[in-house]
Structure formats: C-alpha cells, structure tokens
Amino acid sequence: MERARPEPPPQPRPLRPAPPPLPVEGTSFWAAAMEPPPSSPTLSAAASATLASSCGEAVASGLQPAVRRLLQVKPEQVLLLPQPQAQNEEAAASSAQARLLQFRPDLRLLQPPTASDGATSRPELHPVQPLALHVKAKKQKLGPSLDQSVGPRGAVETGPRASRVVKLEGPGPALGYFRGDEKGKLEAEEVMRDSMQGGAGKSPAAIREGVIKTEEPERLLEDCRLGAEPASNGLVHGSAEVILAPTSGAFGPHQQDLRIPLTLHTVPPGARIQFQGAPPSELIRLTKVPLTPVPTKMQSLLEPSVKIETKDVPLTVLPSDAGIPDTPFSKDRNGHVKRPMNAFMVWARIHRPALAKANPAANNAEISVQLGLEWNKLSEEQKKPYYDEAQKIKEKHREEFPGWVYQPRPGKRKRFPLSVSNVFSGTTQNIISTNPTTVYPYRSPTYSVVIPSLQNPITHPVGETSPAIQLPTPAVQSPSPVTLFQPSVSSAAQVAVQDPSLPVYPALPPQRFTGPSQTDTHQLHSEATHTVKQPTPVSLESANRISSSASTAHARFATSTIQPPREYSSVSPCPRSAPIPQASPIPHPHVYQPPPLGHPATLFGTPPRFSFHHPYFLPGPHYFPSSTCPYSRPPFGYGNFPSSMPECLSYYEDRYPKHEGIFSTLNRDYSFRDYSSECTHSENSRSCENMNGTSYYNSHSHSGEENLNPVPQLDIGTLENVFTAPTSTPSSIQQVNVTDSDEEEEEKVLRDL
C-alpha cells in the first residue's frame, strides 16, 4: 500500500519518485464525533472528523478556531497539519488542547515550527508505534444538526470498495488530502478532531484506536495530485502519539455543502451495524452471537434411574448356602431347550430376591441393572464359587441333552427373502463358465430361455441348443412377475445361463429338414378365449398326460399385478386332449440345429412389434441385477415385491428334473426377423423340431397390433419344454444341475397352486 502524502499548496512536491498519483475518486466526506452522552458510562472516548473534497481553493485566514487534527494513514505515520495562522485563535487552541489532554493524558501535544521567514509551512509525516486497534464506521444521512453520537469500540467496513482518496476542504486550496493504495484501503490509526462552529463550542473528543474503511464515492469531483515533504524536524517520540494543533478554518464555511456524510465511531464487539441507506451488495456482515454453555448431565446407561440401596443386602452368598434347589432344565411349549446358567446368572438368581425386597419401588429392569453393577464390583476371588457352580450346571446339561446346540429362537431372527440354499437344497450345482460360439447382435435386450424336456439325458454344446423362447422386459412394470413352471419327471438336462450382452444362437442357421410332417397332428388351435381384466389372475394350466410317455408337462401362468384395470384380449388355454410327440434322443446334435423361437407370448397369438407393449405375458418387473454370480440373489425375483414364485419353489425342493436352459438378452422391440433366408414363412415363423428329426412349423400372421390374436395357433411341443423365470444376469454362461423326484407329488402341488 502506498503511503499517503499530504500536498501543500500551491506547489505539490513529491517525497520521492513514485507512480503517478490517482485522481480524487470521491465526493465530500464528513465525519464528526461529539462527546458521548452522559447516559453512556461505558463509552470511553468520542471523536469527530470532517473531511470534504475540494481542490483549487486557497486557504483563507478566517479558519475555524480550535480544530485539532491527527490523521494517521498507516500505523507508522502521523500527518502533522500546519499551525493556525490567526493569532487570535491560539488561546482557543490551547484551551482545546487542555481539554483533549483530559481525555488522553498519555498524548503529547507538539506545535510545529512557525513560518516566520515567510516560508510555507508543510505537513510532515512522522513514524509512530503501530497499534492494533479498530474503528467502526457508520454511514448516515446529513440532517439539520451535525451532532452524531459515537460508541466506544468496534470494526466495520462501510462498503465493498474502500475510497482511495480522502480530502480536506477549506476556503482556499486544499491543505492536504490522502490517497490509499490501489486496492482501495485507507487505514487510520488515530483520528482526533475538535470542531467549533460559530459560538457553539463542540467539546474535543478522541477515537482511541481504529481502522477507517470508507465507501468509494459515486462521482468524481476533483482531480488532485498528492505530494509531501519529507519529515524535516524529526518529531518522533517513540511510542507516544503526536498531536499537532493545525489551522482551524478548513471546515467552517463549507460544512453546509457536505453531501455524503460519514460518521466514524467505535462500537462494542459483536454489535450489529445497520445502514440507513442501501447497503452495498458485496458487504458481508458477521455478528458474534454469545453462546451460554449449558451444563449437560450425562447419566450413565449402566446406572438405574432409581437409587437402589444395597447397604444391608449381602451380595456374596455362596451357592451352597443359598438353599435354592436345582431346577430341571425345562423346555418351553415349542420344545425349545433353555441354555444352562452362567456364573452371573447363578449369582443373580441368589441375590435378586434380597435386592428386590430391599428396594420395593424399583422395577425388574432397574434391579437387573443394579445386579450387573454389583457383579462387576466383585473380585475374581469372590466370583470363583459362582463360576464353579456354573460349570457343574453346564456338565449336567450336557448329560441330559448330549446333542444339544444353542439356537436362537426363530421369532427373534430377521426374516429375509428366499435364498438359493432354500430353493435348491439337496441338489447338485455345477457351475461351468464357457464362451458363446455364435453371436447375433441385437439392439436392445430381451431374454431367451431354452429348456427342452427329454426322457434321456442329452448334453448339447452351448451353441447347439434347442428352441429358444424370448422373454421380454415389459415397458410398464408391475410388482408381480408371471411364473411359468415346467417340471418333468424322468428328464435330465442342464441349465445354462448366457451372458446378457451376447445372445447365443445356433452356429448353423435354422434349416428345414425333410421328414414326415406332423403339422396336422401337433399343430393345436385354441378352443376357447378369455377376456382378462387386471388385477384378475390369469391361470393357464396344461396337464397333458400320455400313457406311453413318462414325462408330464405342467405349465402354470399366474398373473398378479396392482396396475389399474386394463382389458387385454384373449389368452387361450391348451386343450388337454392334444397329443404330445414322444421325445427321443437326437442322433447328431451338431447336424440338427433347431431355430430359436420367438416371444413366448407368440405361443398364444401375435407378438408385439413395438418396444412399448402391455405386459400381458410378464407384467411384473424383470429382476435381473447386474451380478457375476447367477444365483447371488433368489433366481425368481428378489426384494420385497409380491411374487408367488418363492412360495411355489418351497414346494419344489428336490423335485425338479434336470432342465437345460439358456438365459440371454435379445431385442426388446421384438421385431422378429427371419433368422435364415431360407425361411419362407412370415416374419415370426418358428420351427419346432421333433426329437426324431421331424420338424413342424407354426406360422402366425402379424397385424402389428399389440393385443393377442383371439384364435392363436399354439404349439404344445414348445409349451411342454418351457421352464421360465426371471433370474440374475450373469457375465458368463453358467450351468446348474437340478435334480427332481416323483411325479405324483408334482401333480398334487400344481393342482393346489
């Protein structure tokens, strides 16, 4: 920060070569402080300073008397203004100095050398001891009276932009003015004024210590330069403050022309400053709020709320002297065997009655807390008899219940969703990671499931799978997925899970195979239609029994949702009289490549052609969390969503046959394109191949509508091989072997469902 230098008229002379001084950037400032009112005993001092900007006027001889000024721009500088020129004002100046010394006895009042030789007196700068004190400034409007009250101490900034120039105005050229640094901070350590107007004598006051930060004026009035003479008389008195009685008429006749008054005063710490005008937008006022410490009583959690007396209660009664008979280890009504007592329980059982009798107002919980405190106070030697007794009880308990293992009560355990261990308990699970052989990229994910039901165990390569059923992810989600079961008795297959980002299809394109066509025999037409309104459950059960076949297919579709009622077109059931072809091993799996099926809803009619469709087949949300393990969560839904699958699976433990399925991601918009150029059927024609090599086709006409066809063509051979359920999406193909049990129990459970 540049040091402020006063400029004496008429010729400004700089102290040393310096950057060009800044012009005056402010209008008139006025700072006045009078004596504090007698009602404020805490106010220690008051000060007044009047500053106004005006250049180009000469110093007149009619200056106001008894004006004492000391403006310190920096902590180590004091500006000494010239001596009053009028001889008749010396008496008033001396009286003012005497009054000032009453307030500040530690000050030294020095008179500058008189200009007897006609030389112009120049203000001088003298270093003094820096003081770390602050002065608060408050902006006020100029009223009819110039009296301004002041406070003791404080600190405040009156604006975001501190004024760079403070000027003194007189009847002639300006006596002196100051300029701060380019950052706009004007610091004053000591400002003392004694202003007298006419006959009204204002008592001199002093601002003890302060930092003045003024607001930058809005208009530029004068363009003045700053200059100063170096200190020549060397008035330096250590740490004492230097006060000079200057000319007194600089503020007299022009006080009425002041436009922007500014009162500088001290305020107590933490005081709130309020501006009468519009406060600067960038000003941030911080107020210290005194916090009274409130004593907080920290009550120990181990101490009872009621004072329990233990003076007359014996707390070291031995188990042999207690006279309490040994109670047999009892079971509760559920057959739960209680644990044997430990040492503390043995001790508490003996002393609880006596402690409760001595404190009848205490409840059982408070008695227990006090017993715990008293037990901790005992020494190890005093606790030893109770540990010995607890060991005897434990040995007796082991003899009575040799295979007993402590188990917490089931009612106290937190219930979780059905886990994989509960679903597939007692089954063998072989997880094999492989890579897809052939990938046909699609735009958006759907899910394809391939689960053939075979009489004889057949292991297909990953790329050589049986017909696929694509499971969509519905756009309108509902909290209950549809479950589709296909348990089969004597079949044994493998479940394969495919990477969701890489859908798997046969390595060879789907082809037509020559052979006796059984389309007339196996192509089924619906015999009835059903109009369904949600949330009415839709059930479709196919219980086809063939005496010559050992496999029985059961399919159940349970729809449960809480969506608003919406009417869907017909869903046709499968007639029970439909014949099902006998399954036989494929002689050459790598030669006969069955083409993948379309959407499973196409089993019942026209599949949707758009990504947004009604969830008529799988209305529930598909729970496919991104996980590397396919069964890290329950494979048939997770979370708190209502689903009938976990309950159903609880009946199917150890009853599933081995199935083979591939879970993959396909296109969501379901634009079922021809998988081979050789397919001459419609866009979504599917070829369902018999295990003997006979292929029969199901052709469906697509009208682009979203609803189902009232009279769909259903392939019971495909429905027989369906075993679908949403599962976790893995990062690689997983194989899980699941075993099964007899047929009658499955039929019984499915009939109940």
Swiss-Prot record:
<dbReference type="GO" id="GO:0005634">
    <property type="term" value="C:nucleus"/>
</dbReference>
<dbReference type="GO" id="GO:0006357">
    <property type="term" value="P:regulation of transcription by RNA polymerase II"/>
</dbReference>
<dbReference type="GO" id="GO:0045944">
    <property type="term" value="P:positive regulation of transcription by RNA polymerase II"/>
</dbReference>
<dbReference type="GO" id="GO:0005829">
    <property type="term" value="C:cytosol"/>
</dbReference>
<dbReference type="GO" id="GO:0031960">
    <property type="term" value="P:response to corticosteroid"/>
</dbReference>
<dbReference type="Pfam" id="PF00505">
    <property type="entry name" value="HMG_box"/>
</dbReference>
<dbReference type="GO" id="GO:0005737">
    <property type="term" value="C:cytoplasm"/>
</dbReference>
<feature type="region of interest" description="Disordered">
    <location>
        <begin position="514"/>
        <end position="575"/>
    </location>
</feature>
<keyword id="KW-0963">Cytoplasm</keyword>
<dbReference type="GO" id="GO:0043231">
    <property type="term" value="C:intracellular membrane-bounded organelle"/>
</dbReference>
<dbReference type="GO" id="GO:0001228">
    <property type="term" value="F:DNA-binding transcription activator activity, RNA polymerase II-specific"/>
</dbReference>
<keyword id="KW-0539">Nucleus</keyword>
<protein>
    <recommendedName>
        <fullName>Transcription factor SOX-30</fullName>
    </recommendedName>
</protein>
<dbReference type="GO" id="GO:0008013">
    <property type="term" value="F:beta-catenin binding"/>
</dbReference>
<dbReference type="InterPro" id="IPR052856">
    <property type="entry name" value="SOX30_TF"/>
</dbReference>
<dbReference type="GO" id="GO:0005654">
    <property type="term" value="C:nucleoplasm"/>
</dbReference>
<feature type="DNA-binding region" description="HMG box">
    <location>
        <begin position="337"/>
        <end position="405"/>
    </location>
</feature>
<comment type="subunit">
    <text>Interacts with CTNNB1, competitively inhibiting CTNNB1-TCF7L2/TCF4 interaction.</text>
</comment>
<keyword id="KW-0010">Activator</keyword>
<feature type="compositionally biased region" description="Polar residues">
    <location>
        <begin position="531"/>
        <end position="563"/>
    </location>
</feature>
<dbReference type="InterPro" id="IPR009071">
    <property type="entry name" value="HMG_box_dom"/>
</dbReference>
<dbReference type="GO" id="GO:1990837">
    <property type="term" value="F:sequence-specific double-stranded DNA binding"/>
</dbReference>
<dbReference type="GO" id="GO:0030178">
    <property type="term" value="P:negative regulation of Wnt signaling pathway"/>
</dbReference>
<dbReference type="GO" id="GO:0010369">
    <property type="term" value="C:chromocenter"/>
</dbReference>
<dbReference type="GO" id="GO:0000981">
    <property type="term" value="F:DNA-binding transcription factor activity, RNA polymerase II-specific"/>
</dbReference>
<feature type="region of interest" description="Disordered">
    <location>
        <begin position="1"/>
        <end position="45"/>
    </location>
</feature>
<keyword id="KW-0238">DNA-binding</keyword>
<dbReference type="GO" id="GO:0000785">
    <property type="term" value="C:chromatin"/>
</dbReference>
<keyword id="KW-0678">Repressor</keyword>
<keyword id="KW-0804">Transcription</keyword>
<dbReference type="GO" id="GO:0001227">
    <property type="term" value="F:DNA-binding transcription repressor activity, RNA polymerase II-specific"/>
</dbReference>
<keyword id="KW-0805">Transcription regulation</keyword>
<feature type="compositionally biased region" description="Pro residues">
    <location>
        <begin position="7"/>
        <end position="23"/>
    </location>
</feature>
<dbReference type="GO" id="GO:0000122">
    <property type="term" value="P:negative regulation of transcription by RNA polymerase II"/>
</dbReference>
<dbReference type="GO" id="GO:0120211">
    <property type="term" value="P:proacrosomal vesicle fusion"/>
</dbReference>
<comment type="function">
    <text>Acts both as a transcriptional activator and a repressor. Binds to the DNA sequence 5'-ACAAT-3' and shows a preference for guanine residues surrounding this core motif. Binds to its own promoter and activates its own transcription. Required to activate the expression of postmeiotic genes involved in spermiogenesis. Binds to the promoter region of CTNNB1 and represses its transcription which leads to inhibition of Wnt signaling. Also inhibits Wnt signaling by binding to the CTNNB1 protein, preventing interaction of CTNNB1 with TCF7L2/TCF4.</text>
</comment>
<dbReference type="GO" id="GO:0000978">
    <property type="term" value="F:RNA polymerase II cis-regulatory region sequence-specific DNA binding"/>
</dbReference>
<dbReference type="InterPro" id="IPR036910">
    <property type="entry name" value="HMG_box_dom_sf"/>
</dbReference>
<feature type="region of interest" description="Disordered">
    <location>
        <begin position="726"/>
        <end position="753"/>
    </location>
</feature>
<dbReference type="GO" id="GO:0007286">
    <property type="term" value="P:spermatid development"/>
</dbReference>
<feature type="compositionally biased region" description="Polar residues">
    <location>
        <begin position="726"/>
        <end position="739"/>
    </location>
</feature>
<feature type="region of interest" description="Disordered">
    <location>
        <begin position="137"/>
        <end position="161"/>
    </location>
</feature>
